């Protein structure tokens, strides 16, 4: 499903490699991977142990090329779970950034779903395109809507079992959201309150949800006020803190390091259409 394979040495150090890499060298020696599929234990020419396995999206996210600070898995996972994003849904995202959240959204909606991701910066969209291509979220040669540019993907690995469910656009959702009957809108923008009215028009009134991700509480307050003004309901804001647990022969304890504040996640539902009983009688 991905254009990568993962090589892990006996110390736990990970190397994300393109599928077509046949040999790879580290301080522990050279590993020969020619004609070898993932799922095996290998020895370097120095006798050190390596595992060759398929990477997860988490492995790729940690090592992919970035143009901006990306959302972390702790926040991405919560967004998908709390918004209830599922197979077959249509999700609009803005902005794309490096494509980290886009990858996970693609995975969540599956082959029968669709992710339309907007960014106003062509240079960011092009970096994201490369990342999305290598996880099978878009096809080779696929264009970015709104960008008059052809892409030469000849050197990229063909992914036959990709999801191919992402559409990239250059556009400003503050001005317009082209899509209608959208299930979920996810906004990673500094001023989502300027998008709320357009989001309200685009969302499916039966099940539409909106998610915003913001670093500052003042931004959250302004966003929530606008959501309420536009009739959005079931509004909740969260902060996710991550701390790993260390397990050793001595005992079990929380790690002294933790991932604290990264951003605030606000989730809300679009207001349903009011039912006019008089019109119903007529």
UniProtKB/Swiss-Prot annotation:
<comment type="similarity">
    <text>Belongs to the class I-like SAM-binding methyltransferase superfamily. TRM61 family.</text>
</comment>
<keyword id="KW-0489">Methyltransferase</keyword>
<dbReference type="InterPro" id="IPR029063">
    <property type="entry name" value="SAM-dependent_MTases_sf"/>
</dbReference>
<feature type="binding site">
    <location>
        <begin position="98"/>
        <end position="101"/>
    </location>
    <ligand>
        <name>S-adenosyl-L-methionine</name>
    </ligand>
</feature>
<dbReference type="GO" id="GO:0160107">
    <property type="term" value="F:tRNA (adenine(58)-N1)-methyltransferase activity"/>
</dbReference>
<feature type="binding site">
    <location>
        <position position="172"/>
    </location>
    <ligand>
        <name>S-adenosyl-L-methionine</name>
    </ligand>
</feature>
<dbReference type="InterPro" id="IPR049470">
    <property type="entry name" value="TRM61_C"/>
</dbReference>
<dbReference type="Pfam" id="PF08704">
    <property type="entry name" value="GCD14"/>
</dbReference>
<feature type="binding site">
    <location>
        <position position="119"/>
    </location>
    <ligand>
        <name>S-adenosyl-L-methionine</name>
    </ligand>
</feature>
<keyword id="KW-0808">Transferase</keyword>
<dbReference type="InterPro" id="IPR014816">
    <property type="entry name" value="tRNA_MeTrfase_Gcd14"/>
</dbReference>
<dbReference type="GO" id="GO:0030488">
    <property type="term" value="P:tRNA methylation"/>
</dbReference>
<keyword id="KW-0949">S-adenosyl-L-methionine</keyword>
<dbReference type="GO" id="GO:0031515">
    <property type="term" value="C:tRNA (m1A) methyltransferase complex"/>
</dbReference>
<keyword id="KW-0819">tRNA processing</keyword>
<protein>
    <recommendedName>
        <fullName>tRNA (adenine(57)-N(1)/adenine(58)-N(1))-methyltransferase TrmI</fullName>
        <ecNumber>2.1.1.219</ecNumber>
    </recommendedName>
</protein>
<comment type="function">
    <text>Catalyzes the S-adenosyl-L-methionine-dependent formation of N(1)-methyladenine at position 58 (m1A58) in tRNA.</text>
</comment>
<feature type="binding site">
    <location>
        <position position="188"/>
    </location>
    <ligand>
        <name>S-adenosyl-L-methionine</name>
    </ligand>
</feature>
<dbReference type="GO" id="GO:0043827">
    <property type="term" value="F:tRNA (adenine(57)-N1)/(adenine(58)-N1)-methyltransferase activity"/>
</dbReference>
<comment type="subunit">
    <text>Homotetramer composed of a dimer of dimers.</text>
</comment>
